[in-house]
Regions:
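Asp-based, Mg2+/Mn2+-dependent phosphohydrolase catalytic module
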Residues: 1-19, 25-31, 37-100, 104-189
Length: 189
């Protein structure tokens, strides 16, 4: 989430951002750190309206949001499109002016798709100690298949810097335990 060119997003017409919290902005359960606070300050300077959309409860969300001061929706039950639509309404924008940023294909990105909102999948932020859940394996399989599909041939990689790195990481995955973000180069950092 920290490597995205937000000025470019603003220049092409986006005015609102819906953020996931855990593993997108900070490791799971962590409070907002200096990087997160700086990011939100920069987004405000650029003119973005920002809202947090999370499956976390009120106390966790409020704790993260203490120094950020963003709007938020907690207990969202993603990928249900209703909270995404509510977030757009709270921002006071149209869907084509809003983009979702999250780390989970089956929650954040699928929810955005279900609500007809653009999205960016970012690299999972983790401490490296937790092993992947089943949905991370499914994400890996889908991103692997992306490389052989017609849209990849048409559109190219999604944030790829080195074409062969995907296959190199796949070989490493077979030999060692790795987090999803270490496997897939198809995400922002």
């Amino acid at each position: 989430a920290y490597d995205i060119d937000y000025k470019r997003l603003f220049d092409i017409g986006y005015r609102g951002i819906i953020f996931d919290i855990d593993n997108t902005l900070v490791p799971h359960g962590a409070d907002a750190d200096f990087a997160a606070e700086s990011l939100f300050s920069r987004l405000n300077e650029l003119g973005f309206a920002v809202i947090l959309l999370t499956d976390n409860d009120e106390s966790r969300t409020a704790r993260f949001n203490k120094n950020i001061g963003a709007l938020y929706i907690c207990n969202a039950e993603k990928p249900d499109p209703a909270p995404y639509n509510e977030a757009v309404k709270m921002l006071g924008l149209k869907k084509d002016e809003v983009i979702v940023i999250g780390d989970s294909m089956f929650k954040d990105i699928l929810g955005a798709y279900n609500a007809s909102i653009a999205s960016i999948m970012v690299k999972y932020i983790g401490d490296g100690k937790k092993w992947l859940g089943w949905h991370r394996y499914m994400e890996y399989a889908l991103l692997f298949a992306w490389h052989f599909g017609r849209y990849y041939k048409k559109l190219g990689g999604i944030g790829l810097t080195e074409k062969s790195s995907f296959f190199k990481n796949f070989k490493l995955f077979l030999k060692h335990e790795m987090l999803f973000c270490d496997i897939s180069p198809a995400c922002y950092k």
